Amino acid sequence: MRKNPIRRLAALALCLAIAVSLTACGKTEPPVEATATPQPTATPVPTATPEMTAAPQPTAETPAETPAETPAEGDAITRYMETMTLREKVGQLFFVRPDALDPAQSPGEINSSETVGVKTLTEEMRSVLTAYPVGGVAIFGKNISDPETLRAFTSDLSGAVRVPMFLGVDEEGGLVARLANNAAFSLPKYESAAAVGASGDSAAAEDMGRTIGAYLAEYGFCVDFAPVADVYTNPANTVIGSRAFSTDAYTAAQMAGACARGLASQGVLPVYKHFPGHGDTAEDSHNGLAVTYKTHDELAACEWIPYSTNDLTGCAVMVGHIAAPNLTGDLTPASLSGTMITTYLRGELGFSGLVITDSMAMHGVTDAYSAGDAAVAALNAGVDVILMPEILSEAFDGVVAAVESGAVSEARLNESVYRVLQYKQLCGIFAP
């Protein structure tokens, strides 16, 4: 049964009131010097990097030790987890397209933006959910026709499994806005995050987040894959562009924090993206592996500023399919890298919240990994939620088999399940 939406909004707003701000309650950085914002400059691509090797295939030998909270013995979530089957636990780690629940669709059809999307929950889809009780569904433009159909769809999805689902959408404002850019919806539209950032007014960014969060909550969503926290510094970059708030790290951080605060005020979980930084890459991870050749110090001084200067309590972070060979020594995507997730995001930056991959159907992963191997590698790297695997059954069953064989420890599984349930409780959609 769905919780009262007002209670859900109030609960998350209260829990996140301390989150995501540079000026109010986040760590305060020195103000940016009053100089002109530099134009984007490309990072030179080296012809060879001596330490660089091909990305290793995932193995069971080096599971990440994620520095997260240990589930307290006897607490309500732990007691609830004791009643869950292995498949129910594994299901909490998967956030899928609704089309992945339609047995009539091929992987190509599921992951294409050109095919007709499912817009209602059918009995066949309910049967798939019985076998694959996923923890979340991400709605795309092709799954949206009109307001009433969408409300019915999100309501049906939420109650279709034992543990209510996260319902998420990409609603950044501007180019990427699945609801606002649909002509059937009379919703506020924004030119772009870049236009908001150029105003220099963080209140405008917070108002954008608040406005978007309000209408997302109205349509049953509790997760927004926003804000874009990337710093746009490479003019050759075609995937981020105006989706970023600024070419300046501190401005991007301030605006992303304000936008996230606005989303949270409406009971919508903000997801900062795309760690370790997609604004300086030349490649689009939809089409292949993106690579940043920056050093640790260069990333810390630019791309990581939105993560290090904002209080991310109660927020989620999306990790991209971006290799950082000068930090890892190879071309493993950050989404599958224990070094990037456990050592840097969780360790150095101190993030103990929900970590989500970017879509695992992107060529940045699928060109080198099977759906099952990618899911296992991500989990062992410290990821909590696997977003949109290329083939749900292969990824899901791959994780189940890995847990049964010990390739993924039960402790590693339980850690992420616990965190997912904590966040669902925070969102007001789950009560153990």
Regions found by a protein language model. Name each.
Residues E404-P432:
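Mid-to-C-terminal alpha-helical segments outside catalytic/metal-binding sites
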Residues V20-A24:
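C-terminal motif of bacterial Sec signal peptides marking the signal peptidase cleavage site
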Residues V90-P98, G135-I139, M165-E171, V223-P227, ...:
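Hydrophobic faces of well-ordered beta-strands that scaffold small-molecule active sites
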Residues E82-T85, E109-G117, L121, S145-M165, ...:
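Second-shell residues forming the walls of enzyme active-site clefts
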Residues G26-E29, E33, Q39-L167, E171-N181:
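N-terminal hydrophobic targeting/anchoring segments and the immediately downstream early-domain regions
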Residues V163-G209:
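Substrate-binding cleft of extracellular glycoside hydrolase catalytic domains
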Residues R2-A13:
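Bacterial N-terminal signal peptides that target proteins for export
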Residues E191-A260, A264:
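A substrate-binding/cap region within the structured catalytic cores of diverse enzymes
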